[in-house]
Amino acid sequence: MANLFCVKDKVVIITGGAGILGRGIAGHLAEEGAKIVILDRAAEVGEQIVADIKAKGGEASFFLTDVLNKEILEQNKKDILAKYGRIDALLNAAGGNMAGATIGPDSTIFDLNIDAFRKVDRKSVV
């Protein structure tokens, strides 16, 4: 049976890729053979993640971005297409750690701050 989740040689963009969630996803997908593109505001951290992936034999690149700036995102898209020729997947991990938009182990989804959750949701959709 074919592997239904094969990401080998797929170009995967991760917004917020320098964050905790984005970094974890990037590392795993790189181990599975994906070509990782980290988009984030934190250049130093993003470049370190790329270096870590490359040190393990993976392929990755970093592009400085701001997910709230459409012009920068359009330029990111052009640069990524120029480098890789295609985009196979986009994972939006930006904004996920905003205070109030997450809950602890002793809370339920009903304890979420709805305004903070909406802000994170809007960032992810942009």
Where are these regions (language model features)?
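Canonical Rossmann dinucleotide-binding motif of NAD(H)/NADP(H)-dependent dehydrogenases/reductases
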Residues: 3-37
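A glycine-rich helix->loop->beta "capping" turn
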Residues: 7, 56-59, 79-92, 98, ...
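A structural preference for long, well-packed, hydrophobic secondary-structure segments
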Residues: 14-27, 45, 62-68, 86, ...
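Conserved glycine-rich Rossmann-like NAD(P)H-binding loop of the short-chain dehydrogenase/reductase
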Residues: 32-49
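The beta1-alpha1 cofactor-binding region of Rossmann-like NAD(H)/NADP(H)-dependent oxidoreductases
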Residues: 43-44, 63-77, 114
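Short, conserved SAM-binding/catalytic segment
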Residues: 49-57
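Substrate-binding pocket helix/loop in short-chain dehydrogenase/reductase
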Residues: 101-118
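Conserved small/polar residues in nucleotide/adenosyl-binding loops
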Residues: 125-126
